[in-house]
């Protein structure tokens, strides 16, 4: 009985899955398009400076630039390793 239910269930069509994935990619690229040209270089240089003092991975640093009307905020988050 379970086998029949499994075979009869409605599956997502590959087109709808592809559409969802494409929407995620487009939204991500639109978010990056609004950032200044210097952001990738700034992120790289900040990571190099932090690595002089603490060993961190590339994905341990997150930089975001938020803009509200006439104010811009540069936010830097670094996940530091635990001392052992």
UniProtKB/Swiss-Prot annotation:
Keyword vocabulary terms for this entry: Cell cycle, Cell division
Family: Belongs to the MinE family.
GO biological process per UniProt: cell division; regulation of division septum assembly
Organism: Chromohalobacter salexigens (strain ATCC BAA-138 / DSM 3043 / CIP 106854 / NCIMB 13768 / 1H11)
Lineage of the species this protein comes from: Bacteria, Pseudomonadati, Pseudomonadota, Gammaproteobacteria, Oceanospirillales
Gene3D superfamilies per the UniProt record, alphabetical: Cell division topological specificity factor MinE (3.30.1070.10)
Annotated protein name in UniProt: Cell division topological specificity factor
InterPro entries membership: MinE, MinE_sf
Entry-linked HAMAP family: MinE (MF_00262)
Function: Prevents the cell division inhibition by proteins MinC and MinD at internal division sites while permitting inhibition at polar sites. This ensures cell division at the proper site by restricting the formation of a division septum at the midpoint of the long axis of the cell.
């Amino acid at each position: 009985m379970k086998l029949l239910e499994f075979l009869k269930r409605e599956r997502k069509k590959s087109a709808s899955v592809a559409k969802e994935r494409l929407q995620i990619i487009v939204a991500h690229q639109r978010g990056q398009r609004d950032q200044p040209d210097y952001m990738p270089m700034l992120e790289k240089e900040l990571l190099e400076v932090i690595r002089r003092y603490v060993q961190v991975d590339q994905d341990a640093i997150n930089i975001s630039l938020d803009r509200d009307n006439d104010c811009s905020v540069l936010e830097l988050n670094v996940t530091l390793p635990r001392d052992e």
